[in-house]
Design a protein with these regions (language model features):
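Charged, low-complexity surface segments at secondary-structure and domain boundaries
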Residues: 1-4, 119-123, 232
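Ser/Thr/Pro-rich low-complexity tandem-repeat tracts
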Residues: 3-18
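A polyanion-binding, active-site-adjacent surface
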Residues: 19-203, 212-213, 227, 237, ...
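Flexible loop residues that form catalytic
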Residues: 209
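Extended hydrophobic/aromatic segments used for targeting, binding, or gating
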Residues: 217-242
Length: 258
């Protein structure tokens, strides 16, 4: 049977969401309506079950305002990791970093179907995410506070869904068949264009080659410049030799003063 993430319903109330939250909810609906076949066996949609913490992150640090200007650098990841955003709803969302550095914490629900080896425990998840520890750890060491970091940068993921095979192996979007990629990437491209319209980034930096390629394809007509930096995944041998100094060199090569 094809796997399908959950589709959220809009809460009742007098006001409708706007800005980044509206884009996020629309993406959750579009991506949540798609089906994925074997070897994908489980699909998690943290924009639905971790909506509270995800939207807290968007509104606190993303929406342009007095403390979060337009024209920042947008760091774009690929998709949620099983022990990061899948648990917390925040990109590169290592539990300790999200809770203790970003100050974001909220009740997290559960996807309709969970792999028994990959349960969603929200902020009670005992495992850390190396990529998130590296990215947010760099932000903390370099900038000191979230406010100082988010004056310069914002972080999102291109795709909101987590894909797992029957044995619990993580499956990244680039491994999906073309027939499944096409509608998914169309939804993600649209959301990225809409996010860029809200944020007006001076530069989009793909965290890894996949994200940079998708950003170039989605944002090319708008003229937003796109670059890339090394992904912090421990599966990347080069990242294990000292990710932070490597990406600082890459960012400086792009003309950024750190």
């Amino acid at each position: 049977m094809p796997s399908k993430p959950s589709i959220p319903s809009e809460p009742s109330g007098p006001s409708k969401p706007s800005g980044l939250v509206a884009v996020s909810r629309a993406l959750a609906r579009r991506a949540g309506g798609l089906r994925f076949g074997p070897p994908t066996a489980f699909v998690y949609n943290p924009l639905v079950y971790a909506r509270a913490s995800h939207e807290a992150y968007l509104t606190r640090y993303g929406e342009p305002g007095a403390g979060t200007p337009r024209g920042r650098v947008l760091l774009l990841g690929m998709n949620p990791g099983p022990f990061g955003m899948a648990q917390t709803g925040v990109p590169f969302g290592d539990v300790a970093m999200v809770r203790d550095f970003l100050g974001v914490s909220a009740p997290v629900g559960r996807p309709p179907r969970e792999h028994p080896a990959r349960p969603v425990r929200g902020f009670e998840c005992p495992r850390g995410e190396v990529s998130g520890t590296r990215l947010w750890g760099w932000a903390r060491e370099r900038f000191g506070t979230p406010q100082a970091f988010f004056q310069r940068f914002f972080v999102i993921n291109y795709c909101p869904l987590v894909f797992m095979e029957a044995r619990g192996q993580n499956r990244t979007p680039d491994k999906l068949p073309a027939t499944e990629q096409a509608p998914l990437f169309a939804a993600c491209d649209r959301a990225l264009v809409e996010m860029a319209a809200v944020l007006a980034p001076a530069l989009v930096v793909g965290v890894g080659a996949f994200a940079a390629t998708r950003a170039e394809l989605a944002l090319g007509p708008s003229g937003v410049p796109v670059a890339s930096i090394l992904h912090p995944s421990p599966a990347n041998p080069r990242a294990n030799t000292g990710w932070a100094p490597i990406i600082e060199g890459q960012l400086r090569a792009l003309g950024m003063a750190l």
